[in-house]
Amino acid sequence: MAEQLPEPVLLSELLHMDKVTIAGQLVEFRHVFYTWIAMLILFIVGLIVRRKLTLVPGRLQNFFEVLISSFENFTVINIGEEGRKFFPVLIGIFLLIAVENLLGLIPLCDAPTANINTNIGMAIFVFLYYNYEGIKKWGFHYIHHFMGPSIVLAPFMIILECISHLARPLSLTLRLFGNIKGEEIVLLLFFLMAPLVGTIPVYFLFLLAKLLQAFIFYILTLIYLKGALESAH
């Protein structure tokens, strides 16, 4: 069955960007190429929205104002007013992952989040980011987040908390990779069984699912950041 699945024609193949030679080694580059495309899309959309800012917003400006303000309010509700300074990073993570996920539904494109290396990179960034902000706020006292409520249990809690925190990047990586890769395989199978009727409803279902996965990544990042910023008693 796997040998009969057709290979889609991708833009990266046409431009010979699937693999590149770096330091004499041939390395996989497809996911990096489509990540660049996702960033380029966000940059262009940002420029368009910025140039068309008016006191009476049009449809595009109104859409982004509602989207951004909703996410900002959600962040402030969960973290407090302090969350406003972290909001640009959080919304940036959501928008980048959302566009990367949706690229998998566009002809000639592939979702970079269907490659585990992309997700590892973003998960490590989240891990380093929330721990950095926690250490920045609490200094040496940040270790209290790992010690638990009792000094007697502290040695055991530190071990458990370290394992828990180290598992977070793995969880973020596998959750996003598994869902996006699985959706692409299922969509291809539906297309083979029913090229038109069976694909259109599933296509829009997966569109929502890909946005949901970006939102889940944003929510988990928010939760980890909130935990790092809260006072440890």
UniProtKB/Swiss-Prot annotation:
Record-level GO BP terms: proton motive force-driven plasma membrane ATP synthesis
Superkingdom of the organism of origin: Bacteria
CC per GO annotation: plasma membrane; proton-transporting ATP synthase complex
Pfam families: ATP-synt_A
Molecular-function annotations in GO: proton-transporting ATP synthase activity, rotational mechanism
PANTHER family referenced in this protein's UniProt entry, alphabetically: ATP SYNTHASE SUBUNIT A, CHLOROPLASTIC
Entry similarity comment: Belongs to the ATPase A chain family.
General function of this protein: Key component of the proton channel; it plays a direct role in the translocation of protons across the membrane.
Subunit description: F-type ATPases have 2 components, CF(1) - the catalytic core - and CF(0) - the membrane proton channel. CF(1) has five subunits: alpha(3), beta(3), gamma(1), delta(1), epsilon(1). CF(0) has three main subunits: a(1), b(2) and c(9-12). The alpha and beta chains form an alternating ring which encloses part of the gamma chain. CF(1) is attached to CF(0) by a central stalk formed by the gamma and epsilon chains, while a peripheral stalk is formed by the delta and b chains.
NCBIfam families in the cross-refs: ATP_synt_6_or_A
Stated name of the protein: ATP synthase subunit a
Gene: atpB
